[in-house]
Amino acid sequence: MRMLYFFDICRKRAFETNEAKKLKKNRAAGIILSMKILNYKYFLYLLIITFSVNFFADNASILKSLKVEDGFKVEIFIDEIDTPRQIAESSGGNIFVGSRSSGKITVIDTNKNTRVIAKGLSNATGVTYHRGDLYFSEVDSIWKISNIDNVLKNSSAMPKKVLVTDNLPSDTWHGWKWIDFGPDNKLYVPVGAPCNICNPSMEAKYNFDKRYASIMRLNGGEWEHVARGVRNTVGFDWHPKTNNLYFGDNGRDWMCDDMPDC
């Protein structure tokens, strides 16, 4: 039963205030929480990204601030991974975590021991497990480790990663990627917009790639568009019956408290 979902904490962008400067200076590791349906064996892993050690006083206050319906319980799963972003679970129970700032892919085994299986990456946020293989993303590349559970079981060495593609745009603004395989067994990858509110006057500056602001699908080594006008999706999934694709999109900045009254 596949129950992996992504959650992100929205923050203000008033970076000139003293408090905001503290947040930028003290940007720190996140925690991964698990939410389980009581009396059932299935777990829903919630990924919470915290931008500062000062954002919440401690883990206890985080748990206290979360409200869930009767029959649910939220507890800390692990709290030692730097800026966790996307997670994926293998058939063997290993949990893989992408990180936005550490440049590492980490595995959490069934005993909650952690191990770095890839490092030195650029915004290695996206991870997905498909047919026994692990896939993970950088800004302009997708990598693969085949037969990942057996590799981890049989060797303590750093697994060998194989390049799937390295021809994606290299812009880091909205360049980090949530990745997943669809019901058609094809790899879906977003390409974010390289600016806040893009307009035609910026095309020369950014040398606009037609894949910007879209969700792409890798089909036989070629990229094809699935959705356009998607500024920066930070999560997507498919309806289990209709196979319709649903996604969240991180919209333009400065539209929260600065938005004018209607």
Can you say where each PLM-predicted feature lies in the sequence?
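Methionine residue identity
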Residues: M1-M3
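Beta-propeller domains with acidic blade repeats across secreted/periplasmic ectodomains
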Residues: D58-C262
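Positively charged N-terminal leader segments that act as targeting/secretion signals
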Residues: A14, L23-G30
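Bacterial N-terminal signal peptides that target proteins for export
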Residues: K36-L44
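Short hydrophobic targeting helices and cationic amphipathic motifs
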Residues: F6-F7, R27, L33
